[in-house]
């Protein structure tokens, strides 16, 4: 959409207009949203809004630019096997979310089949006043902003808001999934569906994630990398959305220590259910998280964008302000309870990428396992 021109301008003309005014216009896409960021000086604010309006309301999706974007994305996918960590996380995500939209990443086949008409139809169905939110920060007043937005976007008509997609349910534990690659290192990912931002468990899960794998003092780093010396990269990821989240513990290790690292990771995940975290560790995690949160909102743009995304996700208006309070209220008992609830071994997804002929122990020691053919 950004590089494909508009009904009023060819792609090159649109690029020239942006360059002449030193306008930075960026479009990115997540699983839930299309994000447009416009940065411009005060002198060219009106001109930039015209360009933004044309791109948002009447994109051209120029065939040549569309084909270029398609080829770039396909080449990225073809190179994915050269990135073992990226490939493992792609397959883990598909297994964790299964048939939900979050479990259907782009494939070479889907990109090959994409047409300009598909893009235009997607735009007609999903981009309209009923689905778009705009946040503005800078040297303009609220009144001036409302007037300018009304002037440039007031005539926009379109479809009604999109019906939200149902959150995925946690998959029951199945076999350990194995991706064969003749590489000297293995990638291990063990994860679960977790609580969303609107869950009472969100703050405790955030703290638990940080303690288990969020820094140099985390349990996984201290045990697997520092004490055992078996991983060049290890940690956890907790990615909360509004109604659900995803938690994953990961490690990259030599082929000859793959099973040992799987055992250690599983042991750490079980330990936070069995024993309370000590007060010093809990205090360290809470302080680190609250300080990081504060430094994430130093500019007016960061605050405006954060508030808009909260509104987009249907979160309370004071969600950002209450975050430190929620983190600091987490107790050791909360961590044990959340670990028992969300790290249930009966709902666990495990993916291992590597060369099983070089593993220290067979994967069968962890139960049934199945080789996975990666479908790019």
Write out the residue ranges for each language-model feature.
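An aromatic/glycine/proline-enriched structural segment found at the starts
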Residues: 99-106, 128-129, 133-196, 297, ...
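Scaffold signal of the M16-like zinc-metallopeptidase fold and its non-catalytic homologs
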Residues: 5, 80-129, 149, 240, ...
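C-terminal regions of mature proteins
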Residues: 133-137, 251, 283-376
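M16/insulysin-pitrilysin zinc metalloprotease superfamily fold
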Residues: 4-9, 38-71, 215, 235, ...
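Stable alpha-helical elements in mature extracytoplasmic
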Residues: 10, 14, 45-48, 65, ...
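M16/MPP (pitrilysin/insulinase) zinc-metallopeptidase core fold and M16-derived inactive scaffolds
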Residues: 1-39, 82, 105, 215-230, ...
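Buried hydrophobic packing residues in well-ordered domains
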Residues: 1, 18, 36, 52, ...
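Short acidic/His-enriched helical or mixed secondary-structure segments at domain edges of catalytic enzymes
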Residues: 72-88, 172-186, 225-231, 242, ...
């Amino acid at each position: 959409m950004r590089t494909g021109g508009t009904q009023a301008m060819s792609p090159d003309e649109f690029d020239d207009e942006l360059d002449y005014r030193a306008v930075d216009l960026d479009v990115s896409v997540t699983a839930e949203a299309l994000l447009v960021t416009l940065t411009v000086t005060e002198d060219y604010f009106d001109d930039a809004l015209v360009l933004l309006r044309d791109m948002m309301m009447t994109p051209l999706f120029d065939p040549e630019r569309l084909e270029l974007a398609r080829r770039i994305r396909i080449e990225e996918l073809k190179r994915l096997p050269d990135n073992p960590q990226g490939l493992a996380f792609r397959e883990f995500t598909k297994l964790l979310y299964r048939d939900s939209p979050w479990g259907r990443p782009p494939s070479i086949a889907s990109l090959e089949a994409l047409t300009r008409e598909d893009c235009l139809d997607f735009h007609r169905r999903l981009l309209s006043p009923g689905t778009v939110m705009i946040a503005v920060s800078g040297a303009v007043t609220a009144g001036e902003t409302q007037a300018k937005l009304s002037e440039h976007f007031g005539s926009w008509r379109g479809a009604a808001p999109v019906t939200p997609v149902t959150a995925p349910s946690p998959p029951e534990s199945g076999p350990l999934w194995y991706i064969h690659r003749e590489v000297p290192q293995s990638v291990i990912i063990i994860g679960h569906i977790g609580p969303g931002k609107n869950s009472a468990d969100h703050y405790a899960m955030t703290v638990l994630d940080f303690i288990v794998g969020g820094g140099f003092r985390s349990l996984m780093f201290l045990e697997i990398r520092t004490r055992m010396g078996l991983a060049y990269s290890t940690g956890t990821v907790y990615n909360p959305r509004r109604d659900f989240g995803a938690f994953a513990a990961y490690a990259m290790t030599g082929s000859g220590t793959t099973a040992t690292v799987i055992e250690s990771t599983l042991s750490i995940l079980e330990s936070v259910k069995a024993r309370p975290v000590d007060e010093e560790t809990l205090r360290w995690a809470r302080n680190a998280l609250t300080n990081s949160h504060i430094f994430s909102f130093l500019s007016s743009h960061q605050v405006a964008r954060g508030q808009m995304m909260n509104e987009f996700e249907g979160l309370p208006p004071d969600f950002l302000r209450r975050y430190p309070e929620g983190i600091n209220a987490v107790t050791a008992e909360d961590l044990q309870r959340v670990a028992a609830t969300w790290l249930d071994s009966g709902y666990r997804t495990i993916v291992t990428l590597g060369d099983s002929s070089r593993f220290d122990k067979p994967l069968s020691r962890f139960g049934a396992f199945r080789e996975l053919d990666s479908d790019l």
